[in-house]
C-alpha cells in the first residue's frame, strides 16, 4: 500500500522539534518554522520514503531480513506488532550493546532462552522447588523482554529499520561498522549521516511512527508476494513451452 502526502500530513509527519534543538545537517529537509517548531518539507520526505520502501520491497523479494528497531514508549507496541505481521525480527526494549557487532554472544543468550522455553514446555518447572521455579521464570521473562524479538534471527540482518536514529545511536553505529544498510526516520534534531535511506520526519508522534512502521511491513509483504508471483509465472511459462522434435 502506498502512502500519500495527505496521510503524512494527517499523521503529523511534518512536525519537527523546537528550532533551538535543530541539527543544521537537516536544513535541506526543513520547509520553515511555525511557533518555534521546525516544519519538515514533506515534498522531500514522500519521495525519500518511497525510495526506502522500494529498497525494502527488493530486499524482501530476495528473502532478506530487516531488523526493526524502536524502543521508545510511543513506538514499542506498534513496532513489535508490525514486525510480527511481516515476519521480521525486532528490538522493542533496550538495545543491548553488541547486538550486531557481537552477535556470537547474543546467539548464546538466544539458545538459553529457547532451551528454557523447551524445558518449561516439557514440564521442568514441576520438578523444581518454589524458589528455583521463581528464579527460572524471572530469568526467562528477562531474556524474553531483551531478545525475544530476535530469537528467530539466525545471523546479523541484511538491513535495519530505525525509528529515531539519535535515540538508537548505538544500533546505527554497529550497523555502520558492519556495513549493514540503515533505513532511518530522522527528525530535525538529529543528523542524517550514516543513514543509507533517510526518511526525514517526526519521530515522536505515535501516529507518524505507525505510518512509517506499517509502510515498511506492507513493503516487505508486497516484496515477498511479488517474488512468489514471479516464481509462479516462471513455472507456468516453463509448462507452456513444448519442444518440437524434428524429423
From Swiss-Prot:
Domain of life, per the record? Bacteria
What InterPro entries does its record include?
Answer: Ribosomal_uS2 (IPR001865), Ribosomal_uS2_bac/mit/plastid (IPR005706), Ribosomal_uS2_flav_dom_sf (IPR023591)
Q: Name one GO molecular function term.
A: structural constituent of ribosome
According to the UniProt record, one GO cellular component term is:
cytosolic small ribosomal subunit
What does the similarity note say?
A: Belongs to the universal ribosomal protein uS2 family.
User: Which PANTHER family does the entry mention?
Assistant: 30S RIBOSOMAL PROTEIN S2 PROKARYOTIC AND ORGANELLAR, SMALL RIBOSOMAL SUBUNIT PROTEIN US2M
Name assigned to this protein: Small ribosomal subunit protein uS2
Q: Which organism is it from?
A: Cupriavidus taiwanensis (strain DSM 17343 / BCRC 17206 / CCUG 44338 / CIP 107171 / LMG 19424 / R1)
Its lineage reads: Bacteria, Pseudomonadati, Pseudomonadota, Betaproteobacteria, Burkholderiales
